[in-house]
From Swiss-Prot:
It catalyses: L-rhamnulose + ATP = L-rhamnulose 1-phosphate + ADP + H(+). PANTHER family: L-RHAMNULOKINASE, SUGAR KINASE. It holds the Pfam family FGGY_N. Monomer. One of its GO terms (molecular function) is ATP binding. One of its GO terms (biological process) is rhamnose catabolic process. Pathway: Carbohydrate degradation; L-rhamnose degradation; glycerone phosphate from L-rhamnose: step 2/3. This is Rhamnulokinase. Its EC number is 2.7.1.5. Belongs to the rhamnulokinase family. HAMAP family: Rhamnulokinase. It is an enzyme of class 2 (transferase). Substrate binds at G83, H236, D237, T238, N296.
Length: 489
């Protein structure tokens, strides 16, 4: 038997993990084992919301060392993280300034300023990326405007996964899928857009040309002295998750469900027309030159904050209590900027309901019900927008990532969207990370080949839409009202 041992470092906004994958060539089987899991979260430092990158690096090294201590020969390592955030370095490779997190308020008002000065359509035609107030474009503008004293010291700007790869290897890389999330990469050239960089105040010399997934960045020397290749995987965690989504045919959509929910479809070409711009659709880079045509949705961040504020530890009990409540008594727009990082999420949700003359969710279960109903309704709206954009309905929706373990939300999504939902795999980002490593090691031919492996090894659960559910009737009523308004317009 021929085995490959690949290690995926998968960092999310709330946790990180070091996972060992064992691939058996002859039977094309893939097994995952968690080596080390650790917390991640936002910190307050000198008036900014930041990441503790030193703690994250220590946790990564600890996890890798644990694998080596077991006597396992590692064939390769890959790192994926969330998008848009970066670390600045000087000529000696030392950090400049703080690793500020995207939920910091320093970018307030800058997206509007960019649209006024550069033109919203021009920015979109150049980047093809969704307008989000925390995109790297606006973060760099905030930095160069608010902390100009740092500029003379900056030699390099590395996105988060590239920074951690650099810390392991001493080699710098700018991986393409994550680079596209910045709103600074030109969609036609796949290189940094000079006009957008100029507006941000950043120097193009801070960046190297983006590289597509599948190259070896450098090597990490383990405690035993072995040199282990560090592969540039699809380093944006959603790009990795999509690789591991067992999409079956062109009519399949995906939803990467976690702190963020990202819903979209794969395409060989980007969508940058006026319809896409009006819907605020993003065209992020994917593996093998594909585009991830998708839309960002605030996701389970809202529920995570409620759990934290109410000190709820028994999530299954909360979900059971939530399921017993009637649907759609309280609904909000999860994508409202007010929910990005409020002081108190529970109070913010209640205020939003109060302002729209709805009942106020008071109990833990009522707050959770408000969130899951609102997410399912937004999923239905976004799926409809995506279908209109491409001119064809979807036949099924694949929900992947940690959020796919929420059976209530999966069923609500199926009912609201009126579409079959297939949930799994849970560890989609990790698996997609491993998939690129196996392709780099010449064990697999391409993404479609890897998806066949995932389909046969992952635990998948199907949710069939119930047209008689409360939320399905609610959606039908909304659509009927919209059509009436359109006829009367």
């Amino acid at each position: 038997m021929t085995f490959r041992n690949c290690v995926a470092v998968d960092l999310g906004a709330s946790s990180g993990r070091v996972m060992l994958a064992r691939y058996e060539r002859e039977c094309r089987s893939l097994t995952l084992r968690e080596i080390y899991r650790f917390n991640n979260g936002l910190h307050s430092q000198n008036g900014y919301v930041t990441w503790d990158v030193d703690s994250l690096e220590s946790a990564i090294r600890l996890g890798l060392n644990k694998v080596c201590e077991e006597g396992i020969r590692i064939d390769s390592i890959g790192i994926d993280t969330w998008g848009v955030d970066f670390v600045l370095l000087d000529l000696q490779g030392k950090r400049v300034g703080l690793p500020v997190a995207y939920r910091d308020s320093r970018t307030n008002g800058l997206m509007t300023q960019a649209q006024q000065q550069l033109g919203k359509r021009d920015i979109y035609q150049r980047s093809g990326i969704q307008f989000l107030p925390f995109n790297t474009l606006y973060q760099l503008r905030a930095l160069t405007e608010q902390q100009p004293e740092l500029i003379p010291h900056i030699a390099h700007a590395l996105l988060m996964p590239d920074y951690f790869s650099y810390r392991l290897t001493g080699k710098m890389n700018w991986e393409y899928t994550n680079a596209t999330t910045t709103q600074l990469v030109n969609i036609n050239s796949d290189d940094w857009d000079e006009s957008l960089l100029a507006w941000s105040g950043a120097n193009k010399a801070w960046f190297g040309r983006p590289t597509h997934p599948g190259n070896v960045i450098g090597h990490w020397i383990c405690p035993q002295g072995n040199e282990i290749p560090v592969v540039a995987v699809a380093s944006h965690d959603t790009a990795s998750a999509v690789i591991a989504s067992p999409l079956n045919g062109s009519r399949a959509a995906y939803l990467s469900s976690g702190t963020w929910s990202l819903m979209g479809f794969e395409s060989q070409t980007p969508f940058t027309n006026d319809t896409a711009l009006a819907a605020n659709i993003t065209n992020e880079g994917g593996a093998e030159g594909r585009y991830r045509v998708l839309k960002n949705i605030m996701g389970l961040w809202l529920l995570q904050r409620v759990l934290q504020e109410r000190q709820i530890n028994d999530l299954p009990a909360l979900i059971a209590a939530t399921q017993a409540l009637p649907a759609c008594r309280f609904t909000i727009n999860p994508n409202d900027d007010r929910f990005i990082n409020p002081d108190e999420m529970c109070s913010e949700i209640q205020a939003a309901c109060r302002e729209t003359a709805q009942p106020i969710p008071e109990s833990d279960a009522e707050l959770a019900r408000c969130i899951v109903d609102s997410l399912a309704l937004l999923y239905a709206d976004v799926l409809h927008e995506l279908a209109q954009l491409r001119g064809e309905d979807f036949s099924q929706l694949h929900i992947v990532g940690g959020g796919c373990q929420n059976a209530l939300l999966n069923q609500l999504c199926a009912d609201a969207c009126g579409i079959r939902v297939i949930a799994g795999p849970v560890e989609a980002s990790t698996l997609g990370n491993i998939g690129i490593q196996l392709m780099t090691l010449d064990e697999l031919n391409n993404v479609d080949d890897f998806r066949q492996v995932v389909s046969t090894t992952a635990n998948l659960t199907t949710f069939t839409p119930n047209p008689d559910s409360e939320i399905a009737h609610y959606v039908a009523q909304i659509h009927s009202t919209r059509q009436t308004k359109e006829l009367c317009a």
